[in-house]
Amino acid sequence: MTTDLSDDGSRVVSRRNFAALSAGALATGLAGCFGDDPQESANGNGSSTGNGDREYTIFASMPAVWDFVRQAAGDHMEAIDLVPVGEHGHDWTPEPGMVEELDGAAGFVYLRDFAAWQDDAADQLEGRDDVHVIEASDGIEFFDSPAEDDDEHWWMDPVECQNGVENIADGLAEIDPDNADDYEANAATFIDELEALNEEFHDIVERAELNSIVVATHDSFQWWNRRYGIDIYSPVGTSPDDAASPGDVEEVETLIEDLGIEHVLYDVGEPAPLAESLAAEVDAEILPLSPVETQIDGSPEVDPSVEMEPDWGYVEHFRELNLPTLETALRAE
């Protein structure tokens, strides 16, 4: 584990590592046909903007991207999230027959460098005339965060998200130029919502007594440090497969006591035994965060009092989970 300095000189504890997925295994996973009706597949989560009768179907590579697509598409296109409800978008990979054909799809929207299967799928689909590949991250510069070099979690920043939404709207307009003005207008409406989230973030930070949080599951949140100056400490890396060493945990326990932190935060899409044990060790409470990488129907494993809906979009994940958690953890109530 490394202890790094943020832009304002504060310490941020995390591990600079990430797991790469096997390209060989991916090739097997891209070997067949998705099916006549993607929404009926047991693999996809079936989330869409409508009833399946629209002319165009767009496949998204993870939940946040799916919501950006449906917001920009409006009534003109179906948006399908390939990641099943309950699966974590960071470490899920397609089963054989899910991606290569994408029967009926007009587009595939993905995140660069987020998961190996997405980049490989985009490379394979680029050669096809019937599927338009849209890189949501196009033109977005990753940065070397305390969690990892080239931290790709830009969608956690509501301001940076605005660029991603515009990229998607531009791609949809290329697929369906007759409705280009609508895609631009839909994106502008959603960008207004993202800007409202940004203002709510700033309001919480301005009212906060603390400036630090501890995340005891994988660290997807360092873009909040860059945008809002929130110091984020984690004994875990940026992948759900990363593990914390006893030394990492002990260092974070010391930081919790030194900084007067009263809450340990966890990713709702992951089991969180470390968050629970760490909270018990330092007499803290656990609170949920969402990196918008998992759709959940009901409650996360850790806390049955948290109720989620499988069709929540980006704004719901932030307003129902992230902002209330930060308000409490940073003592901005």
Predicted regions and their residues:
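Extracytoplasmic metal-acquisition and chelation regions
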Residues: T2-R15, A19-G29, C33-E333
